[in-house]
Amino acid sequence: MGFLTNEKLLIVGAGGAIGSNMAQTALMLGLTPNICLYDIIEPAVHGVAEEMYHCAFPGANVTWTTDPKEAFTGAKFIISSGGAPRKDGMTREDLLKGNCQIAAQFGDYIKEYCPDVNHVVVIFNPADVTALTALIHSGLKPNQLTSLAALDSTRLQEQLAKACGVPQYKVTDCYTYGGHGEQMAVFASKAKVDGKPLSEYNISEERWAEIKHDTIQGGSNIIKLRGRSSFQSPAYQAVKMIEGAMGGTPFTWPAGCYVDCDKCGFKNVMMAMPTTIDATGVHFTEPQGTEAEMADLRKSYEHLCKMREEIIALGIVPPVEDWKKDNVNL
């Protein structure tokens, strides 16, 4: 079996549903034979490793560990789904604080054990701020760390396809930018359906409102239908992001990236932008949209700034002016 690279891929949180799906997807796509599965829960990660062995992927060299030093040392590519899910009785602040503390430790492990890592993808929520926290603590350059944001755009693509009665792949140029959550900005003014402008389909204001709602609530709908949060789609898209970073097919769905751009008017946040991930890292361009779309993006950015200030107030990351003390690349 041919592989894209032989470099070590570390999957953090590998004992969970997302992590185990990432391991299998990476092997099925032939990204690398050398995959390390890491989790703090020994039986779960051990079980995932056994499943991968039973798949009998030719040439695969799958290892597992609960020791962070063993896991992170030598890793060149990392995907982390290692956050904690929201549980009954937890407030939003509980989730924010808990997962950002996990993200801070994750970043510290990178700085200590694998500072030469090529690319890192963070996918545990709230992804915009967990990724920002990890970046600050890791010491990495901004183009080396991204967060998962593509699902919002693929959900928009699905909703538009259903509304227009076409296969999903025939809907193009529809994206969501800004935050990963209810404050996301939906950009569809340049969308095309089977090569035709979306405007030719005369979607009513009421139907458009439904499309936006169903896009934003796409993750919640999965929970209602399946009784648990998404795991197959985030696993697949995260692995495709790493594939781009490994030098495979560039990843062109929006990704969360560090933005400090005077021209855009967005400063010191992680947010979804028009991006490409390739072997040189992640690169973003300025979003282009209608006045209303850009206004929604500004609102989303302002919400991200508030979340950033929350983790600063919690002491998880320092004030913006002190970030260079932890990461000279910011």
Please report, for each region that a protein language model flagged, where it lies by residue:
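N-terminal Rossmann-fold NAD(P) dinucleotide-binding loop
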Residues: G19-S20
